[in-house]
Design a protein with these regions (language model features):
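Short, low-complexity disordered leader/linker segments with a strong preference
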Residues: 1-46, 353-355
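Short, polar/charged alpha-helical segment
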Residues: 35, 47-71, 85, 145, ...
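Loop/turn elements at helix/coil->beta-strand transitions in domains of secreted/extracellular proteins
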Residues: 43-46, 66-69, 91-93, 171-175, ...
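Extracytoplasmic ligand-binding site segments that recognize negatively charged/polar headgroups
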Residues: 49-56, 78-79, 91-231
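A ligand-binding cleft/hinge motif common to bilobed small-molecule-binding domains
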Residues: 102-106, 228, 233-251, 301
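Periplasmic-binding protein-like
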Residues: 126, 205-210, 217, 249-272
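Mature extracytoplasmic/periplasmic domains
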Residues: 262, 266, 271-328
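Conserved C-terminal helix/tail region of periplasmic/extracytoplasmic solute-binding proteins
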Residues: 326-355
Length: 355
């Protein structure tokens, strides 16, 4: 039986970076034409590294209005940062679109991002942007559980409703989580719960949780995919409209943890030294200055969280109260990243999947 567990009234917020291996978006065939009035004279191709190809229509709109072609590469935030560092900070992509903001904070500290100043930046919530305009947020990713009802029934397993429940021995070997060193979403889980629980209690929690984790996947989508494939009973996963849609296709339960919903802002930035830096910088301004573009982003993202980023925008209404989110300091996502990941690597041991 498909059901939605939540004691909170909430709606879901609705290959290589350095080689030319991208694909041109084609979900809606773009019409390349002369730039529209108000757009600067831009040319060439803008290469975008993104966490998903769901944004094709947004980039096609940019192409139609500016004449700049777009190539997209799909990569998680941790992979982007690792490859950028490995190549000495010389990118072959221009725009970084999506992924946990912790990696963007680290990239800024490493001098790998371009400063992007524009008037509309003043309308963005300062909590979710860099004070010096080196990175911005396009929304928030919230995290909960996806449970395979068939497996849960076969294993006589209770549906977990809280983070504390996952420590029960009945879930041993049946929980999958993504490697937080690769998945910004799951790094957000670790950082948020450590902030909420405190260092000592938080690390004790993850040590205990590790006993029940089957393995740590290399992409943020692994928990969702493995649960619907009947491989594992419980996945720690992002929650959005794409997860909601699974209720119509699979015998699963979506769980919003009653003891707190972790989240992480999703970043947007321009790579320093990018080949088409002008197009990438203009895209950032084009996106945030026009509410129509942000509304399209919300539609494609199947989230309303862009309203949190730009509270003044019209055309999108926030589908939930931010009170449901855990109370954390966003700045710590970046400053604590290296220490947390180093400690978590030891904790994971041979359960971490890196390839």
């Amino acid at each position: 039986m498909k059901k939605l567990i939540s004691l909170l009234l909430v709606l879901v917020m609705a290959l290589s970076l350095f080689a030319g291996c991208g694909t041109t978006p084609d979900a809606t065939e773009p019409v390349t034409e002369a730039p529209t009035d108000g757009a600067p004279a831009l040319s060439g191709t803008m290469k975008v590294v993104a966490t998903s190809e769901a944004y094709v229509d947004l980039f096609n709109k940019f192409t139609a209005e500016t004449g700049v072609a777009v190539e997209m590469l799909s990569m998680s935030s941790g992979e982007v940062l690792s490859k950028l560092r490995a190549e000495g900070g010389t990118p072959s992509a221009d725009l970084w679109f999506g992924g946990g903001v912790d990696a963007f904070m680290s990239a800024k500290d490493d001098g790998l991002l371009e400063q992007v100043n524009f008037d509309a930046a003043a309308e963005l919530d300062p909590t979710y942007k860099d004070a010096d305009n080196y990175w911005f947020s396009k929304g928030l990713t919230i995290v909960g559980f996806l449970v395979n009802n068939t497996l849960a029934a076969e294993l006589e397993m209770d549906i977990p409703t809280a983070w504390a429940d996952l420590l029960d021995e009945q879930y041993a070997g049946e929980i999958i989580m993504s490697n937080p060193a690769i998945s910004g979403t799951n790094y957000g889980v670790v950082n948020c719960l450590l902030q909420v629980m405190g260092e000592e209690e938080g690390w004790a929690y993850f040590e205990a949780l590790n006993e029940n984790i089957a393995y740590y996947g290399r992409r943020g989508s692994d928990p969702k995919n493995k649960v619907i494939a009947d491989e594992y009973a419980v996945g720690i996963t992002f929650l959005d409209g794409t997860i909601d849609a699974l209720l119509e296709q699979y015998d699963v339960t979506i769980v919003y943890p009653t003891d707190g919903i972790p989240y992480i802002p999703e970043g947007v930035a321009v790579f320093k030294g990018a080949e088409n830096v002008d197009a990438a910088k203009y895209f950032v301004e084009w996106l945030y200055a026009n509410d129509e573009n942000l509304a399209l982003l919300a539609q494609l993202d199947q989230k309303s969280a862009v309203k949190v980023i730009k509270p003044s925008m019209e055309g999108v209404e926030l589908a939930y109260s931010t009170d449901i989110l855990v109370d954390v300091d966003v700045a710590l996502f970046g400053s604590q990243r290296e220490d947390i990941l180093a400690k978590f690597e030891v904790l994971m041991g041979d359960k971490a999947v890196t390839e």
